[in-house]
């Protein structure tokens, strides 16, 4: 078996003529794929991420395993689903996995220099960023690690609190983990993401002669929406921002558990504030995109383009007013789907429509770099998609939040709430209803489809909890 694993890894590497490539893992925070121009956005232009997409494989059906920061990051870094490691909060996966190697640690154990800049495992934003603390980071994963402190909502500039400020009693930005927009004074290095990009470029230059695994975590567009003034130019005046189409009585067929924790109603955001929120989010994305460009330029200037696998993604998606939902957590596509781009030197650019999970990154990158793929990992190796984007490794992607579970097939989305998914349900025909306006779960015509998903969900939950961790579920 060991010989077979080595042989498969060698085949993967030889196909591209690469020997022990570097890994540059870039992750954004709270980024919806729909905000990127390479995923079809016509308003928010992201030329640097687009550049990466034009050179790599862009996945159109990639899904996170937890629809908010803590579970998602603990999952893809540990190699286990959130419920397997009992992580639905904001902690480290280390207590659950013991001495088992995380994704970065696996590379470290195999001779790679592993470095982290800013948020890879969970960090509180903005609180942890303001303080420059480690959050739920895992020291054993890294050879060296760096935090990028920034002023966040306290950055000098013109700011407004949009959430729960209908009477405008809060004259400027107040509080952090809330919908605040700040058109900030000063240059990029005032902010956490500017510092992160600069440190990443510095580390690339320092370690260019030894294989490295570099994790670069940008905190934008996570709230507060803070970016240099120049990144707001394309989105002013905010009144020109377009809100998504909405239906009257849209929530009538959505279970209570399916109503997102942030809505236009409970945030008391009128149309003006909603449009400004979209503009502030896009400005934050534009800033983050420029910082991605700086890192990619630094890699090229170091002469490492031809020996580095680059991954770009987000920890989960984000609602920008769809169904009058905002932010993350929801199990609808806007929140559960993520952008994913993998640039592999020597391969032709492609677009892959197969279902993949962030959990697949650990085994896939291990294989592509010639490392043994631990058999305990719950993700799947998708490396063959680099040469054959039509290849499929799963019939459904799986994601969770604190209230329920998602099974996402090519043509269907099934959401089950409650303990073990035995509560209320949502069922959407994604071919006929891609924006998920009509819940078919109670329609007798779809009884067979619903029954199939109920059986499938029970099997998936059993699979998640069947592992080597020795935990009681």
Question: What residues fall within each predicted segment?
Answer:
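Residues forming the ATP-binding cleft of Hanks-type serine/threonine protein kinase domains
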Residues: 431
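Sec-dependent N-terminal signal peptides
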Residues: 3-14
């Amino acid at each position: 078996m060991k010989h077979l694993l080595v042989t498969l890894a060698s085949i993967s590497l030889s196909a591209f003529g690469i020997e022990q490539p570097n890994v540059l893992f870039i992750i954004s925070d709270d980024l919806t794929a729909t905000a990127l121009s390479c995923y079809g956005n016509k308003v928010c232009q992201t030329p640097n991420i687009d550049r990466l997409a034009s050179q790599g494989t862009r996945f159109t059906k990639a899904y996170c395993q937890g629809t908010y920061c803590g579970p998602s990051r603990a999952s893809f870094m540990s190699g286990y689903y959130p419920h397997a490691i009992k992580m639905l909060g904001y902690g480290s996966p280390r207590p659950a996995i013991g001495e088992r190697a995380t994704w970065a640690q696996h590379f470290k154990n195999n001779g790679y220099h592993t470095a982290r800049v800013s948020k890879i495992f969970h960090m509180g934003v903005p609180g942890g960023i303001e303080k420059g603390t480690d959050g739920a980071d895992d020291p054993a994963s890294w050879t060296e690690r760096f935090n990028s402190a920034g002023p966040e909502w306290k950055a000098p500039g013109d700011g407004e609190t949009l959430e729960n400020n209908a009477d405008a009693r809060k004259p400027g930005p107040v509080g952090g983990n809330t919908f605040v927009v700040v058109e900030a004074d000063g240059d990029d290095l005032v902010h956490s993401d500017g510092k992160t990009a600069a440190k990443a470029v510095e580390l690339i230059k320092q370690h260019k002669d030894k294989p490295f695994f570099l994790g670069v975590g940008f905190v934008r567009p996570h709230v507060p929406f803070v970016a240099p003034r120049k990144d707001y130019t394309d989105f002013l005046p905010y009144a020109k921002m377009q809100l998504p189409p909405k239906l009257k009585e849209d929530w009538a067929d959505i279970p209570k558990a399916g109503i997102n924790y942030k809505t236009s109603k409970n945030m008391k955001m009128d149309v003006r504030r909603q449009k400004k929120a979209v503009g502030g989010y896009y400005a934050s994305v534009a800033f983050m995109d420029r910082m991605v460009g700086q890192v990619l330029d630094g890699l090229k200037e170091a002469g490492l383009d031809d020996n580095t696998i680059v991954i770009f993604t987000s920890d989960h998606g984000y609602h920008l007013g769809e169904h009058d939902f905002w932010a993350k957590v929801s199990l609808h596509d806007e929140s559960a789907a993520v952008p994913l781009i993998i640039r592999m030197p020597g391969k032709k650019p492609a677009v892959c429509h197969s279902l993949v999970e962030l959990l697949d990154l650990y085994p896939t990158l291990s294989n592509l770099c010639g490392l043994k793929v631990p058999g305990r990992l719950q993700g799947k190796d998708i490396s063959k998609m680099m040469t054959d984007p039509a290849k499929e490794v799963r019939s459904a992607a799986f994601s969770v939040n604190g209230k329920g579970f998602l099974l996402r097939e090519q043509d269907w989305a099934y959401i089950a709430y409650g303990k073990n998914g035995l509560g209320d349900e949502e069922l959407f025909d994604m071919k006929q209803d891609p924006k998920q306006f009509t819940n078919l779960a109670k329609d007798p015509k779809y009884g067979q489809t619903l029954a199939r998903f109920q059986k499938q969900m029970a099997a998936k939950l059993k699979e998640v909890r069947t592992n080597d961790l020795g935990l009681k579920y």
